[in-house]
C-alpha cells in the first residue's frame, strides 16, 4: 500500500540494538498531516491525497489558501503536498495522518533540501584533485582548461565548474525505520537525511523496498 506524509527533521542521535550494535539515526517529526483534498482517476486522472502540515495564522494567509483549507475544518497550513495512493476511499477530508502509518522495519524514501554551502570551487564541489602545492606550480586549486579554442570553440553543457553547492532537492532511497514513537509522532530512521535541522521532508514508501 502506498503511503506518505510531510515531516520535519529534528536532528541526529544514536541508539543501541539488542545485540549491542550502535545505530546512527535521524529523529523526524512525522505529522500530524491533515487531508485537505482527494484526487481520483475520474476527476484528475490519478489517485492521490493532498495533505497539510504545520498550522499557520489564517490572518496572514491569502484568501485562496484559506478557502482551500476551509473544507477540512482544521485551519490553514504552512506546507501542502500531494502523495499518490492506491485507495483514495480509505481517506476522508479532515483525517489526521500520523507516524502510525509506518512500522519498525519499513523502508522509506526521504526527500529534502540539502544544506546550502554557497559558491564553492571545483575541489570542494566536484572532488577535483588539484595541482602541485610547491616546486614552481602556478596551478593549485584552479579547474584547468574548460575547452579548446579551435574545437569545440565553446564550453560543453554540464561542464564541472565552480558554482553553487547544496541548497537543492535531494532524495535518499531505502532508509530503514528503526523505531516509531506514536505518542510524540516521531520516527527514528537509520542513517543521515538531507537538510538542516527543522528542515521539511517528504516521506514515502521506498520504491526499492524489495
UniProtKB/Swiss-Prot annotation:
Annotated transmembrane regions: none
GO cellular component: cytosolic large ribosomal subunit
Protein name: Large ribosomal subunit protein uL3
Lineage, uppermost ranks: Bacteria, Pseudomonadati, Thermodesulfobacteriota, Desulfuromonadia, Geobacterales
PROSITE patterns in the record: RIBOSOMAL_L3
GO molecular function ontology, one term from the record: structural constituent of ribosome
The keyword Kinase is assigned to this record: no
Regions annotated as coiled coil: none
Keywords of the record: Ribonucleoprotein, Ribosomal protein, RNA-binding, rRNA-binding
Family: Belongs to the universal ribosomal protein uL3 family.
Pfam families the record matches: Ribosomal_L3
HAMAP family for this protein: Ribosomal_uL3_B
Primary role: One of the primary rRNA binding proteins, it binds directly near the 3'-end of the 23S rRNA, where it nucleates assembly of the 50S subunit.
GO biological process, one term: translation
Quaternary structure, from the entry: Part of the 50S ribosomal subunit. Forms a cluster with proteins L14 and L19.
Entry keyword RNA-binding: yes
Amino acid at each position: 500500500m502506498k503511503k506518505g506524509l510531510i515531516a520535519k527533521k529534528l536532528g541526529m542521535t544514536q541508539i543501541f540494538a539488542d545485540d549491542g550494535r550502535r545505530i546512527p539515526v535521524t529523529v523526524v517529526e512525522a505529522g500530524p498531516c491533515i487531508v485537505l483534498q482527494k484526487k481520483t482517476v475520474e476527476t484528475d486522472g490519478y489517485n492521490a491525497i493532498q495533505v497539510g502540515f504545520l498550522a499557520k495564522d489564517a490572518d496572514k494567509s491569502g484568501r485562496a489558501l484559506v478557502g482551500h483549507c476551509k473544507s477540512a475544518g482544521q485551519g490553514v497550513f504552512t506546507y501542502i503536498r500531494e502523495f499518490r495512493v492506491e485507495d483514495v476511499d480509505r481517506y476522508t477530508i479532515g483525517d489526521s495522518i500520523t507516524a502510525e502509518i509506518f512500522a519498525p522495519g519499513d523502508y522509506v524514501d526521504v526527500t529534502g533540501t540539502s544544506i546550502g554551502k554557497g559558491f564553492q570551487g571545483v575541489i570542494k564541489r566536484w572532488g577535483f584533485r588539484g595541482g602541485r602545492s610547491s616546486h614552481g606550480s602556478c596551478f593549485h586549486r584552479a579547474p584547468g582548461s574548460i575547452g579548446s579554442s579551435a574545437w569545440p570553440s565553446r564550453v560543453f553543457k554540464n561542464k564541472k565548474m565552480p558554482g553553487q553547492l547544496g541548497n537543492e532537492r535531494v532524495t535518499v532511497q531505502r532508509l530503514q525505520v528503526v523505531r516509531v514513537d506514536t505518542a510524540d509522532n516521531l520516527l527514528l530512521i537509520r542513517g543521515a537525511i538531507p537538510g538542516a535541522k527543522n528542515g521539511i521532508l517528504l516521506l514515502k514508501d521506498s520504491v526499492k523496498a524489495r
